[in-house]
Amino acid sequence: MHAVQRQIAEQLKVQPPFADQNALQAEVARRVSFIKECLQNARLKTLVLGISGGVDSLTAGLLAQRAVKELRASTGDNSYRFIAVRLPYVVQADEHEAQASVDFIEPDERHTINIGSSVKALAAEVKAFDGLPASSVDFVLGNTKARMRMVAQYTVAGAYQGLVIGTDHAAEAVMGFFTKFGDGACDLAPLSGLVKNQVRAIARHFGAPESLVEKVPTADLEDLSPGKPDEASHGVTYAEIDAFLHGEPVREEAFKIICETYAKTQHKRELPYAP
């Protein structure tokens, strides 16, 4: 393992590869316990998570639903619940997969909040967009969509006195592939430290359909590049990112891209700067 790989892995608290099925099951149990502890320590009984249709929110949702089921069983308190929230922007191209994901999770409640009108209303009021290239406006509004989705989730959590779950994991964190104060905002991040193939392995452990487990990851935030794969944005594959984080050799160009991207996105992984 290169020294830089070791340093980054330590900073992101990357978990080692699952040695076998027992190790995977133990990790699932540990993360479910973590969710339960967070909820009980906050003296709250509701978990809220936006479900996009991707494997990350699918896996986080499965962990959350198991956590509240176990809390109901162990405490006899049936008020513990998990709320899955669909947050489409107008019409989502892969809505069928998103609904299939929610169906498989079987949350206690499901809500749908369309963020389209809110994002468009805000965009209409921003004079700074005047004269900007369409691509620049599209990029900014992509981040606005992510932030509006988090506003919606925290609004639901506030109404039901709950905690918001995030889906960030090590393979996204190392690339800074999240919107600051958007999908990067949450109260607890149960996938933290996992690489992408471990997230998929946990989804499989729950019996999730391969069509959802292996669905091409996409943030799908930009109107001019609908459904753009994450890997096209990264310039490297998730397999290469996973290998890098686990200290395995990767091609020279991938190593360079990951290290440079990690350095320039450091501000996204830190608290606001202060004097």
UniProtKB/Swiss-Prot annotation:
A molecular function GO annotation: NAD+ synthase (glutamine-hydrolyzing) activity
Gene3D superfamilies associated with the record: HUPs
Residues annotated as binding ATP: 50-57, 167, 196, 218
CDD domains: NAD_synthase (cd00553)
GO BP: NAD biosynthetic process
Keyword ATP-binding in record: yes
Gene Ontology cellular-component terms listed: cytoplasm
Pathway: Cofactor biosynthesis; NAD(+) biosynthesis; NAD(+) from deamido-NAD(+) (ammonia route): step 1/1
Keywords: ATP-binding, Ligase, Magnesium, Metal-binding, NAD, Nucleotide-binding
The EC number(s) this enzyme carries: 6.3.1.5
Residues the record lists as binding deamido-NAD(+): 147, 180, 187, 267-268
Binding site for Mg(2+): 56, 172
Presence of the UniProt keyword Mitochondrion in the record: no
Catalytic activity, reaction form: deamido-NAD(+) + NH4(+) + ATP = AMP + diphosphate + NAD(+) + H(+)
Pfam families: NAD_synthase
Family, similarity comment: Belongs to the NAD synthetase family.
Subunit details: Homodimer.
NCBIfam families xrefs: nadE, PRK00768.1
Function description: Catalyzes the ATP-dependent amidation of deamido-NAD to form NAD. Uses ammonia as a nitrogen source.
This protein's name: NH(3)-dependent NAD(+) synthetase
Gene: nadE
